Amino acid sequence: MSEEKVTFRVVEQFVSINGEGRRAGQLALFIRFAGCNLNCEYCDTKWANEAEVSYEEYTVEQLYQMIKNSKVKNVTLTGGEPLIQPNMNSLLNKLREDKELCIEIETNGSVDIYTFLPKAKSSNMQTEAEHDVLSDNVSFTLDYKTAVSGMEHQMFMKNYVNLRCQDTVKFVVGSVEDLQKAKQIIEKYHLVEKGCGIYLSPCFGKIEPADMVEFLVENRLNDVNVQLQLHKFIWDPEQRGV
């Protein structure tokens, strides 16, 4: 299908600051896509997954022009689950051409990200693959769904083999057991050694951030971050478009 015919369902787009992750506090353009294949207990954007949610359809070129017109270099593709949008690679291919942009894809961990990674184009696979890792302006923030989500059984674990140094893993935790599971994943897949960003976020009302810090101290988890969602301290936690 040609780019002109491919459309994406967008439920909202806005400029604000990144509330979490490696670029927390920096301006970003958020593009939220409709629909999700999971139903997490603590999801704060379930409205975007409802069958009757209102949306606008954009082509690849229209989304690219939206991004350029925003004059913001950090772009977060979120949802819902952006990777279940048909023909997402057509959009990513377009965005990869513009190295002035820093694209972050927030994905729920159930979709195989390998499908969306850049592939070598010649027989010199290793050299090109290494170059693509260093030059790719598209990164993934992989959300590992711990037990508190009710969706842990949906995790596609091979994703953790394919993570690169520019990618991030986020664990939303609600108990010491969730923290222990996060530690197991971090160690099993050598996420620190890979250079991935690693963040632990508390599920509101389930665990105290101080207990998370104590867990890091007790287990000497270097290069692992406890993060609180910055935007929820600045605005009402239920407010949209911020």
What are these model-predicted stretches?
Residues 84-242:
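Conserved AdoMet/S-adenosylmethionine-binding subsite of the radical SAM
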Residues 35-37, 71, 220:
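Short loop/turn positions at the edges of beta-strands in beta-sheet-rich folds
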Residues 13-18, 45, 73, 77, ...:
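Generic, low-specificity signal for short hydrophobic/alpha-helical stretches with a mild N-terminal bias
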Residues 34-36, 63-64, 155, 184:
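Short hydrophobic/aromatic-rich motifs at helix boundaries and adjacent loops
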Residues 1-32, 37-54, 232, 236-242:
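N-terminal [4Fe-4S]-dependent radical SAM core
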Residues 6-11, 15-18, 38, 42, ...:
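Amphipathic, alpha-helical segments enriched in basic
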Residues 8-11, 27-28, 39-137:
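Conserved Radical SAM active-site core
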Residues 18, 64-68, 187:
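Generic structural signal for well-ordered alpha-helical scaffold segments
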